[in-house]
Regions:
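Hydrophobic pocket/interface hotspot
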Residues: 34-35, 44, 63, 74, ...
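Charge-dense, helix-prone N-terminal extensions
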Residues: 19, 26, 59-61, 73, ...
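Hydrophobic ligand-binding cavity/cleft-lining segments
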Residues: 9-54
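A conserved amphipathic terminal alpha-helix motif
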Residues: 119-145
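A solvent-exposed, acidic/Ser-Thr-rich amphipathic alpha-helical stretch
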Residues: 51-61, 65-66
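Hydrophobic-ligand binding "helix-grip"
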Residues: 64, 68-113, 118-121
Length: 145
């Protein structure tokens, strides 16, 4: 049984072996404000055009965002500094491993930045981050001015 499980894990690691690393700059905002967008259900919902977001700031809590299309668990929360979560899309195959997302927030001279590492994820997620998160967050912040 162990050998079968190990083989499945190896196969899945080849299928979803992409590691995405991105550093995104946001002008005129703070690390704290960016952190809030990810873990405040109302703000998270707003950046996605009202899609339901059930999320908390509590380590160990499960979450569901994008109208239930993305689910996971808060693995580590360092207020205003870091979020580590497991992620699973509702279209992933049953045997697919959960991906691990790490977001590190920091202030810069002109605003703030997010350093993202997303491991064990489908390749198409790289471009989806810009479309689904970075561009909508920038639009949301512009509306706040």
């Amino acid at each position: 049984m162990f050998v079968i499980l190990l083989c499945r894990i190896i196969i899945q690691s080849y299928k979803m072996n992409t590691v995405i690393e991105q550093t995104i700059q946001f002008k005129g905002t703070s690390a704290s404000a960016l952190f809030d967008i990810f873990l405040d259900p109302k703000k998270h919902s707003r950046i996605h055009g009202g899609a339901v977001a059930k999320i908390t700031r509590i380590e160990g809590d499960k979450f569901s965002v994008l109208d239930g299309n993305l689910n996971g668990k808060n693995l580590l929360i360092v207020p205003d500094r870091m979020i580590v979560q497991s992620w699973r899309g509702n279209v992933w195959e049953e045997n697919d491993l959960d991906s691990i997302l790490t977001l590190v927030f920091s202030n810069t001279k002109t605003g703030a930045q997010i350093y993202l590492t997303h491991s064990c994820t489908p390749k198409q997620f790289k471009e989806l981050w810009r479309k689904v998160y970075w561009d909508p967050i920038k639009e949301f912040l512009a509306e706040q001015d």
